[in-house]
């Protein structure tokens, strides 16, 4: 059985690119979210094996969404996606409970390496 993934990013092109990379590698993308609040709701509905989370999103940012998801499921596996220059936010996300991060723009191989590491 393939691992299930929830992809959360406010930019549709990023959600599509990440979903394509994961699907081609055999992962099952079970849902998408464009805000942190939506990410929390979809997490409750879908219980995915992994959440790919953008840091900067409208309504509720990725870091607050990580905190909410960790309250629901302390062992949730969350991989942050951040733009260059957001190191302080990445540290905050890891402290909130995220397992790892990748920096945009990224190579598909880097995405898959990080996903495998987080799911181990």
What spans do the regions from the language model cover?
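Two-component/phosphorelay signaling modules centered on CheY-like receiver
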Residues: 12-31
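Receiver (REC) domain active-site loop signature in two-component systems and cognate sites
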Residues: 57
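C-terminal output helix
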Residues: 88, 106-115
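Active-site beta3 strand of CheY-like receiver
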Residues: 46-52
């Amino acid at each position: 059985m393939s691992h299930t993934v929830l992809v959360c990013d406010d930019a549709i092109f990023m959600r599509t690119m990440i979903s394509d990379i994961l699907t081609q590698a055999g992962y099952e993308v079970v849902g998408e979210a464009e805000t942190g609040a939506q990410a929390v709701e979809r997490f409750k509905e879908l219980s995915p094996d992994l959440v790919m989370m953008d840091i900067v999103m409208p309504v509720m940012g990725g870091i607050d969404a990580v905190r909410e998801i960790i309250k629901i499921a302390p062992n949730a596996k969350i991989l942050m996606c951040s733009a260059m220059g957001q190191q302080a936010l990445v540290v905050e996300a890891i402290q909130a409970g995220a397992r790892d991060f990748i920096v945009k723009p990224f190579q598909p191989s880097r995405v898959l390496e990080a996903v495998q590491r987080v799911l181990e």
